[in-house]
Amino acid sequence: MSKEDFVNLPFFVENGWIKRTCPVCGRTFWTLDPERKVCGDQPCEEYSFIGRSVGVKPESLSATRKMFIDFFEKRNHTPVKRYPVVARWREDVYLVGASIYDFQPWVTEGLVPPPANPLVISQPSIRLTDLDNVGKTGRHLTGFEMMAHHAFNIRDQRVYWANETVEYAFEVLTKVYGVKPEEITFIFDMWSGGGNAGEDYEVIVRGLEVATLVFMHYKTAEDGSLIPIENRIVDTGYGLERIYWLLTGHYNVYEAVFSGVIDRLRKLSGVEKPPDDLMYRLALKSGRLDFKKPLEALETLRNVSREVGISFEELQRVLEPNEALYALADHTRTIAWMLGDGVVPSNSGAGYLARLLIRRSLRLLRRLQLELPLSEIVLWQIQYWRNDFPEYLELQDEIRDIVDTEEERFEESVKRGEKVLGALLGELKSKGLRVVPAEEIVKLYESHGVPPELVKEKAESEGLEADITGFYSRLAEMRSRAQVQQKEALQLPLDPSRLKEFRPTRLLYYENEKLAEFEATVLGVLDGKYVVLDSTAFYPEGGGQLSDTGVLVYEGGECRVKYAFKVGDIVVHECEGNAPPVGARVKGVVDMERRLALMRHHTATHIVLGALRSVLGKHVWQAGAQKTPDYVRFDFTHHKAITPEQAKAIEALANRVVMEDRPVRKYLLNRTEAEKAFGFTLYQGGAVPQTTLRVVEIPGWDAEACGGTHCDRTGEIGLIKILGFEKIQDGVVRVVFKAGMPALEYVQGMGDKLKNLQEILDASYEGLEEKAKSLKSRIEALEKEVKKLREELLKGGVSVSPVATVQGVQVYVYFSDEYEPREAALAISRTRTSSVILAYNSKGNFALKVTDDLLDRLDAREIGRSVCESLRGKGGGVRDLYQGRIDETKSVDKVIVEALRQALERR
């Protein structure tokens, strides 16, 4: 179809629709109203549905959704359950931003069949790129449901296309929702997103866009050009909340959707609802508000204030607390969706976006002077939407705990960050700067947790400026698209393109995971050591599992396989010794002790993951793993340190599954069928770029898409021993454990150490703990005594000579591992004036003291920061004493002298 064909659809041409060009925006649109001149979209026309009857009056948002789904189900569309808001099946995005995200790229590219065709869905979606508009414009939401009907015309299959799609949209609006035909306009345009593009129609009713109908038949190239594809996808999106708002005629979408939560917040905060006249006039113009263009938005608000007859300042005083209420109501539902679908707040990925939203919500709470915990409001949302999202009810305790933990961390980080902010503002003022740089505001938020609102508030109190317009939106936009981690390229002296001449390797390790010996033919030898076989039982490194090793035996010799790796469908064996000739038959012998250890550890990983989710909660997701013959290092998402009781429970549960000797099933499934059967926990190890998935299932416990080698039954593992847990970054915890013989050897080693300790301490097994406590008490008492003696010695003074004198100020540098740097610096300063003292030790810990008589001229913090910059360190302090740690200690003398000289010159 040409562009003209999409514009002149039979539905319009044959049913009396009038085609016009909007004189305001210049776009082509269709209407049944002969009097209509403009397209009806914003900003071409004001809203005209506020306070008016537009169609039927649904009793709830749920009823509005049901009406839509029922309509399409009666027209042979299969209802499909919503997908999680976390797009774990994709590598390019973190969150689902539209219903089509559920089917990109696998279904849209025709690689796997859709779950139904055609289908209807109502998909919760999250978009944070308009975050600064939420609560202010009346229409923007961070979380919304996109109702959609999709048809997948894959290759030669025809379901339906553009004409039928437009007709369906017209019917659902008029026959289901009761909208008058002449009040609907269809605006023609182009759309792109998620790597695809196509012509589209925006559907407008009384100034409000309620749907977008996209006819996806292009792929977007990296340079932005459009490449036609053979598949034609009907991608529609109907805003559930917007349609409900349209039909109820509320002043804004927040009052329509979140009235129950907003009413509770009003009662607790004492924020009064603005007068109806003001709300009505503002609502009519709110479609034109966009705070990404602050000057235009403020001018619109000034016009409203003039119309209502109040000052602009009074308008802002009335609106600001209400905007905070609206934003808080929106944010807390989105937080419930994110945490309920497994996001753990952190400093990266989807966790970063969850933290961003939680911290913004906490600032809104403070602005409203509400004392209740943020988690309380999130739980209101879960209860309020319990019939729509019943799956979140069982996660309430988990979600409360996560939000409460985030709130505690936020308060702590703000307290710490205020000191950093104060130092920064002081530094800017000392340099004569009047504006806080944008990059510093981002750094304060990301590194120290200081909200931009606080930066602006403190900066203005110091006579500085801080522009935070659109801060949250920009930050969310920067972080919304996944930075696809490039897997480490194989460090080979050969070009992988040289492998193209070889056919795919037959993977014997999948046919029989305990196959120790096999025969194969040599297809090629590259650079004398990289051997390609027609089939192999050597598992190549992948999925966090190390490769097999062993030998290749052939007539006249043998070589050792020290590493195996996979390039595409070809397994390459890196050999030591004389490689076999091309065409030779070889016998491969796999090191089965290593293979079995790897199998036990990999299967144990699946078991431990199930135990982690059972004990800690469903928010636990794999964040990285390495399986070796001796141990497993497994990283997972979690928001708190693991308690000893939890560690014991996890280990006990994992070993119970081992002792139950459950079967471990391994089979191939079509991607769509696998997702239907097991959901998206399949992708614990990350997105799998394959149309057919190898599923490893421990019935009733765990099922994952996994390409590793595994035991046939859990009992083959023997024993799982957890060595410990540690937090490796915010929101990510690491567990290290052993399985099989390494676990047994570890336990035996612990027993040996206990026996040795009994001998050393001359204590029985039962009395060992008491003896250790007694020794610890004695050591602590002795350490206190030693400290007192050191302090007495320091009172007698420290013999040290100045290393330099700068403008009358003497510089002392003192090195000692015997005394703490702070104690030494203070001791030296007691007997000296007009001095700067730096004491440090071999660990790089240092203290910098400025004597009291110099405090009107010098600041230890200024000198200390300069020292840290030069010697790769960091620290903090007060005007007379700065403490920290430096990585380099060789040139301390020169650096402190230069730092002092610069500080004096600035005075």
Swiss-Prot record:
E.C. numbers: 6.1.1.7
Compartments where found: Cytoplasm
Gene Ontology BP annotations: alanyl-tRNA aminoacylation
Keyword tRNA-binding: yes
Cofactor(s) it depends on: Zn(2+)
Presence of the UniProt keyword Zinc-finger in the record: no
Gene3D superfamilies: 2.40.30.130, 3.10.310.40, 3.30.54.20, 6.10.250.550, Bira Bifunctional Protein, Domain 2 (3.30.930.10), Threonyl-trna Synthetase, Chain A, domain 2 (3.30.980.10)
Binding residues for Zn(2+): H602, H606, C706, H710
Stretches assigned to coiled coil: none
Domain of life: Archaea
GO cellular component, as recorded: cytoplasm
GO MF terms held by the record: alanine-tRNA ligase activity; aminoacyl-tRNA deacylase activity; ATP binding; tRNA binding; zinc ion binding
InterPro entries: aa-tRNA-synth_II/BPL/LPL, Ala-tRNA-lgiase_IIc, Ala-tRNA-ligase_IIc_anticod-bd, Ala-tRNA-synth_IIc_core, Ala-tRNA-synth_IIc_N, Ala-tRNA_lgiase_arc, Ala-tRNA_ligase, Thr/Ala-tRNA-synth_IIc_edit
Chief location category: cytoplasm
SMART domains hit by this protein: tRNA_SAD
Functional note: Catalyzes the attachment of alanine to tRNA(Ala) in a two-step reaction: alanine is first activated by ATP to form Ala-AMP and then transferred to the acceptor end of tRNA(Ala). Also edits incorrectly charged Ser-tRNA(Ala) and Gly-tRNA(Ala) via its editing domain.
Domain notes: Consists of three domains; the N-terminal catalytic domain, the editing domain and the C-terminal C-Ala domain. The editing domain removes incorrectly charged amino acids, while the C-Ala domain, along with tRNA(Ala), serves as a bridge to cooperatively bring together the editing and aminoacylation centers thus stimulating deacylation of misacylated tRNAs.
Protein name: Alanine--tRNA ligase
Name of the gene encoding the protein in the UniProt record: alaS
